[in-house]
Regions:
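Alpha-helical membrane segments and adjacent membrane-interface helices in multi-pass membrane proteins
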Residues: 56-117, 318-322
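Short helix-perturbing small/polar motifs within transmembrane alpha-helices
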Residues: 92-97, 103-148
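Transmembrane alpha-helical segments in integral membrane proteins
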Residues: 194-220
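Small-residue-rich helix-loop
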Residues: 221-275, 279-283
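Hydrophobic transmembrane alpha-helices
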Residues: 2-72, 76-80, 84, 292-301, ...
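Long, positively charged, glycine-interspersed low-complexity recognition regions
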Residues: 4-18, 28, 261-345
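Membrane-interface interhelical loops and short interface/amphipathic helices
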Residues: 142-192
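Central hydrophobic cores of alpha-helical transmembrane segments
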Residues: 80-90, 129-137, 294-305, 318-320
């Protein structure tokens, strides 16, 4: 009886027999490698060209292209993907928006490139992701601060004008109760505008990781989804949360700096709450995997956790407790903890 399965030599164990029939990864040939490099460079350039229009979504395409281009390659592939992405990003941004958005494009491209490179080369650590998000946040705020100061205004005035414009355009079709809610939302947006920058930066980081993971799968590189269950923030996040709470409590005792202290404390608490909520959801996913919960019910569980976080901050409380209690029994050297260790891929 004919069979399409390859012939396995005698004397192999069951484990080596499986590896002989279905290898974990396939090394590309010379022609296939060039094709993959060209495809990755083109996709990375396309994503970079539109980085100013949609920095979060474009980071998926950029990281995907970079992962495809440099997967299994060396310095030449990294240089080609980085230079092409930067050039395409600068040219595309200049043609669409002029020079104003070029610095933000460069930041998005560099972030997506570095995270994709770190993922493909198995160098990512959990702490590095948060450092990347914090760095991108500070750079974005710095860019807008310099830009507004060159125009004779401030970043606070810029945010206020944008919020007022959005509120004014939405006022016309609302009743009195809706207008009151909208004005309250305006006050919240004015107080938490730094958190908006952090949310955008975190979106760039997460989408870059997703693009790199998808690109690695496309190139038949060994990948794993265990990073979702191994997400573990550094202890300094809990310390920052405590500092933010302390700043909010000390605000009334510092009359000269009450408004600034309260604003800084509120934004530190909100940013760390977002990060801790992700850890709480990761604990939930880990627990559901241990219990072999079906995908449908796991999805409903995550959606419920998001709702409970928005209503009662429950997920962030679970994440904060996990930082101390280590429910998943993970190694506590978080800055050296790999999200996707090679031994588990």
């Amino acid at each position: 009886m004919n069979s399409k399965r390859p012939v396995v030599p005698e004397g192999l164990t069951s484990e080596t027999r499986q590896l002989a029939v279905r290898p974990e990864s396939v090394e590309p040939s010379g022609r296939g490698h060039r094709t993959r490099l060209i495809m990755g460079v083109v996709l990375g350039s396309i994503g970079s060209a539109y980085a100013a229009s949609a920095p979060v979504l474009s980071s998926v395409v950029i990281a995907f292209g970079v992962a495809v281009a440099i997967g299994g390659g060396g310095r030449l592939e990294r240089a080609a993907s980085l230079i092409s992405a930067l050039v395409a990003g600068v040219v595309g941004t200049y043609l669409l928006f002029g020079t104003y958005e070029i610095p933000m494009t460069v930041v998005s491209v560099l972030c997506a490139f570095l995270l994709a490179w770190g993922y493909v080369s198995d160098r990512l650590r959990t702490g590095w992701l948060l450092l990347a998000a914090a760095a991108v946040t500070c750079i974005m705020i710095g860019i807008d601060t310099v830009s507004t100061s060159m125009q004779g205004t401030s970043i606070t005035d810029l945010v206020a004008s944008m919020v007022d414009e959005a509120v004014t355009s939405s006022m016309g079709s609302l009743d009195m109760e809706g207008k009151a809610v909208l004005l309250e939302t305006r006050d919240q947006m004015m107080a938490y505008w730094p958190t908006v920058y952090f949310t955008v930066a975190l979106g760039i980081v997460v989408c870059s990781l997703f693009g790199a993971w998808t690109g690695a799968r496309t190139c038949m590189l060994p990948v794993s989804s265990d990073g979702v269950y191994r997400y573990d923030v550094p202890l300094c996040v809990a310390e920052l949360f405590a500092v933010g709470v302390a700043a909010q409590l000390l605000g009334p005792f510092l009359p000269a700096w009450q408004e600034e202290t309260a604003m800084v404390g509120a934004n530190v608490v909100m940013c760390t709450r977002i990060v801790l909520a992700q850890q709480g959801i990761s604990v939930l996913l880990w627990r559901m995997r241990e219990r072999r919960v079906a995908v449908l019910f796991a999805t409903l569980g995550v959606l419920s956790a998001v709702w409970l976080e928005m209503s009662f901050a429950l997920a962030s409380v679970v994440g904060l407790l996990d930082v101390v209690a280590n429910f998943r029994h993970l190694p506590r050297n978080r800055m050296d903890l790999r999200l996707w260790p090679a031994s588990e891929r």
